[in-house]
Amino acid sequence: MPRAADVSRISRLFPQGAAPPAWLVVALACAGQFLVVLDVSVVNVALPSMRTDLGMSAPGLQWVVNAYAIAFAGFMLLGGRAGDLYGRKRMFLVGLALFTLASLCGGLAQDGWQLLLARAVQGLGAAVLAPSTLTIVTSSVAEGAARARAIATWTAVGAGGGAAGGLVGGVLVDTLSWRWVLLINVPVGAVVLLSSLRWLPESRAGDRRRLDLPGAVLVTAGLGVLAYGISQTEAEGWTAAATLVPLAAGLALIALFLVVEARTAAPLMPLGLFRARAVSSANAAMFLSGSAMFCMWFFMTLYAQNVLGYTPLEAGLALVPSSLAVLLGSKSAPRFMPVLGARNVAVIGTLLAAVGFGWQSLMTARGDYLTEIMFPGILMMLGAGLTATPLAALATSGAAPGEAGLVSGLINTSRTMGGSLGLAVMSTIAAARTARAVGGGGGTPVALTEGYALAFRTGAGVLLGGVVLMVVWLPWGKGAGPAVARVSGVSASADGDVVVDVVDVVDVVDAEDAEGAEGAGPAVASDGAAATRFEK
C-alpha cells in the first residue's frame, strides 16, 4: 500500500517546479480510475455481511449498489463538463477528496441509511473524478504510439479494478471486516490526493459552455425515485399510494429532465443526437442489455454466500473465471467486428449472455460449482464483453467526429442507468418470489434459490428482447480494421467519456501496428473504439 514516505521519496526525485515525467502523471490518473472501478465491484461480496451487521432488508440491500450507480450515472457527464470549465486537475482533486471522505464515512457507518448516503456521495465523487482521468492521460502524452500505450494502460487498469473487485473484497471481508472494502480507499486515496496535488498538471478546454446542473439533478433524482417506487411494489403492491406516488414522481422528474434538455443552451444530454439511428438504437440496446447484465454479480454473490455457504473469499474466488471472461470478450470483439460486423457481434454476445442467464436460472440449493456458478458465469460475462464494444462503436459511428466523446459518454450512462433500474426490478422480483416460497413452507435456502432463479430467468428474457431490438433496429455494417487511438483531451473530458467498469473496456491498438492510419482511416471514438461507417 502506498505510504507518505513514498510521496516524500518521489518528491526528492522531482522537485517542486520541475515538470513531472509523463509516466508519473499517467500513474496518478490510473490510480484514480482504479479506485472508481474497483468500488463498483468490491462491495458485492460484502453485501451479506453488511446486511447482517446493519440490519438491512433484502430489498434494501440493492441500494448499496444502486446508490453509487445512480449518482455516478446521473452526474458523470456533468463531471466531464466541469473539468473543462474549472480544470481537469481541480476536478480530479475535488472528486478524489469527496470519494475518499465518503469511503471513510461509509466504513464507519452504524446504520443502513448512513451507509447508503455515503455510497451516494461516493458515486458523486466518482462522477467528478473519473472523466478527468482519461483526459489527464491523453493531455500528458504526445499523440501517436506513446499515447496509444498510455490509453491501453488506462483501460487495463480499469479492467484490473473490475476483475479484482470480488477477490479484493473477499480477502478484506474474511480477514478484517466488510468495513474495509470502503476503508481501504482512505489511505490509498490520501496518498494519490497528495501526490496529485503536487505533480498533476492543470489543463482546461477552451469551450466555456455552462454547466447543466438542473439536468444532472433532475435525471439523478428521477432515476432514484423511480427505482425506489419499483422496490416498494414487493411490500406494498402496485396499487398502493406508497408505490404509485414515487413511480409517478420519478416519471415526472424524468419528463421534466427531457424538457430542460430540449430548452437549455448547453444540455447535459443533447436530444438531437438521438435523431441518428445508430446513436438511438445503440443506446437503447445498451440500456436494455445493461439492465440484465449489471445484476449478475449482485445475485451470484448472494447465491454463493446465502445459499451455498461460501465465505466472502470463496465467493470472490468463485467469480474470478467470470471476471476473466469479460476481459476475453472485450479483447476479442474488435477482432471479430471487421469480419462479422458490429451488429452481429453484439447480437452473438447478447445471445451468449442470454444462454448463460438461462443456464444460471436452473440453479439449485445444493448447487455444484462448475455447472451452477462457473460455466454459466463465464457465458454471461463473455457475452457481456462481446456486446459492449460493438455497441459503443455503432453509437459513435452515428455521431459527427466532434461528438464522438459525448456519444461514448452517453453509451456508458445508458448502461449504468439501465443497470440501476434493472437491479431495482430484479431485486423486487426475487424478493417477492422468495417471500411466496417461504409462505409455502419452503426452507430458506430453497426459497432464496427460487427468488434468484426467477431473477436470472427474467434477465434471460430481457436479453432475448434485446436481441430482437438489435436485429430490427441497429444499422448493419462491418467494422473497420485496427486504428490509431487518436484521443482528443477536450472531448474525452467534456463529454464524460469514461470506462465505468470492466464491461466497457475497449481494445486500443498501438500506432505502429496500424497500417496507413496516419492522416486517414476511420474516425476513432475518444474511448479508443474504432468508429466505423454503417449503412443507415
Describe the role of every protein-language-model region.
Residues 22-45, 58, 241-253, 262-437, ...:
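12-transmembrane solute porter fold
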Residues 2-31, 382, 393, 443-536:
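Transmembrane-helix exit segments and adjacent C-terminal regions of multi-pass membrane proteins
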Residues 36, 65-68, 72, 99, ...:
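Structural signature of transmembrane alpha-helices in multi-pass secondary transporters
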Residues 2-198, 340, 351-354, 358-361, ...:
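Transmembrane-helix bundle of Major Facilitator Superfamily
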Residues 94, 146-158, 208-218, 243, ...:
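Cytoplasmic-side transmembrane-helix entry/capping segments in multi-pass membrane proteins
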Residues 111, 143, 174-175, 197-206, ...:
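Transmembrane helix-loop junctions in multipass membrane proteins, especially transporters and channels
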Residues 152, 174-286, 292, 310-311, ...:
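Hydrophobic transmembrane-helix bundles of small-molecule transporters
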Residues 50-51, 82-83, 168-176, 230, ...:
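Interfacial helix-cap and linker-helix signal at transmembrane-aqueous boundaries
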